[in-house]
Regions:
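Hydrophobic faces of well-ordered beta-strands that scaffold small-molecule active sites
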Residues: 10-16, 38-42, 67-71, 97-99, ...
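Alpha-helix-loop-beta-strand connector modules within alpha/beta enzyme cores
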Residues: 52-71, 115-127, 174-191
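Active-site-proximal loop/turn and secondary-structure-junction residues that shape catalytic pockets
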Residues: 18-20, 44-48, 73-75, 101-103, ...
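A C-terminal functional module that forms or caps the active site or interfaces directly
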Residues: 165-215
């Protein structure tokens, strides 16, 4: 468990899981450099439709915040492809990348090294938001293996991780066994429509909440941001 934590910090990250650059531009214009936001998360839908460079260019018209690429899921290939992945992201102007290293520890180490060579921030995840993911809930992946992903990444010097808001008990068990540092950053999907409650994660000091449809489909995104900001500031 982490001790002597710094003050609680909440930030928001829009998950840009859309097809049209017009939607990206709309959200980027509204968010800008708002202090309640950490950055933007883009995935395969935008990357495969338009190319990541075009996505980055669109966001950069309105914001200097970090742009995170979530390949959904990266690091599930052989170790050697990590270098090509990292170079592709760097050329596009991406700042950070999320890895879910289900291909094993050799791939994890190689992909971390490749991202660092390209000066990209590394974020590692092992647990996902949906049901029937872990073996204990009817999924394919051994619970212990998921825990080992986090521990191995910590041993490799990673200090930024993905944990889902929708599974507080499972995250708690990971926190009890993995030696996360007090300054570790946690990126959490599940805020908004999936019903995740950040107040259930008292052990996390630096918490970046990933929000998708609740913001992207809001009738009034500006009002949604104002309401969310008020709630998160009161919880800090």
């Amino acid at each position: 468990m982490m001790n002597n934590k710094p003050a609680k910090i909440f930030k928001l990250i829009p998950a840009l899981d859309v097809l049209e650059l017009a939607n990206v531009e709309h959200i980027a214009r509204i968010v800008g450099n708002n202090e309640m936001f950490y950055g933007f998360k883009a995935g395969f839908s935008l990357g495969l439709t338009h190319g990541l460079g075009k996505v980055v260019e669109t966001i950069r018209r309105y914001s200097d915040l970090p742009i995170i690429y979530d390949h959904q899921k990266a690091a599930t290939d052989i170790p050697d492809t990590g270098r090509l992945f990292a170079q592709t992201l760097r050329r596009a102007g991406i700042n950070e990348a999320i890895l879910f290293p289900q291909a094993g520890p050799v791939t994890l180490e190689a992909w971390i090294s490749a991202l660092r060579e390209e000066e990209l921030k590394v974020i590692v995840g092992g647990l996902m938001t949906h049901k029937a993911y872990m073996h204990s809930e009817g999924g394919f992946l051994n619970d212990q293996a998921i825990e080992t992903i986090y521990r191995t990444a910590v041993d490799l010097g990673v200090n930024s991780f993905v944990v889902p808001l929708t599974k507080p008990e499972a995250v708690d068990r990971i926190f009890q066994t993995v030696p996360f540092r007090p300054e570790t950053e946690f990126y959490s999907p599940g805020y908004g429509r999936q019903g995740g409650d950040p107040s259930r994660f008292a052990s996390i000091a630096r918490h970046y909440l990933i929000v998708g449809r609740a913001l992207l489909e809001a009738a009034d995104p500006v009002a949604w941001i104002a309401d969310a900001s008020t709630q998160l500031r009161s919880a800090s």
